[in-house]
UniProtKB/Swiss-Prot annotation:
Xref: InterPro entries: ATP_synth_F1_dsu/esu, ATP_synth_F1_dsu/esu_N, ATP_synth_F1_esu_C, ATPsynth_dsu/esu_N
Keyword presence, Thylakoid: yes
A Pfam family that the UniProt record links to this protein: ATP-synt_DE_N
Protein name, entry field: ATP synthase epsilon chain, chloroplastic
Localization in the cell: Plastid, Chloroplast thylakoid membrane
The protein's role, per its UniProt record: Produces ATP from ADP in the presence of a proton gradient across the membrane.
CDD domains cross-referenced by the UniProt entry: F1-ATPase_delta
Record-level Gene Ontology MF annotations: ATP binding; proton-transporting ATP synthase activity, rotational mechanism
Gene that encodes the chain: atpE
Gene3D superfamilies, A to Z: 6.10.140.480, F0F1 ATP synthase delta/epsilon subunit, N-terminal
Native source species: Nymphaea alba
Oligomer and partners: F-type ATPases have 2 components, CF(1) - the catalytic core - and CF(0) - the membrane proton channel. CF(1) has five subunits: alpha(3), beta(3), gamma(1), delta(1), epsilon(1). CF(0) has three main subunits: a, b and c.
Xref: HAMAP family: ATP_synth_epsil_bac
Amino acid sequence: MTLNLCVLTPNRIIWDSEVKEIILSTNSGQIGVLPNHAPIATAIDIGILRIRLDDQWLTMALMGGFARIGNNEITILVNDAEKGSDIDPQEAQRTLEIAEANLSKAEGKRQVIEANLALRRARARVEAINAISY
């Protein structure tokens, strides 16, 4: 038995295919979803989506949004997403270093909040590359 997973951004469809299982970062922690999961709607945090095909795990960096799960259908609507395999490791590492430097230089609440969000996005991209296969 499988799940139909659809990952959408405002500009494009990132993924639309059958999967065996996913692990999703929500605002209240990670959840695993297998076939016949109870219906839920949840907010998605900036983080990693792990996707299990037959015997292979793939990763995707998600930049926050919402998910709806029910009847073996998973629809994920996010601000932005990138497949781990599409992320350039050197560019992601540089972006992480810049985000860390910007956070240390941030002054005022607004700059600190924006720098923290940029750092979380950069960490999610690096984690998507470095995620260990299960």
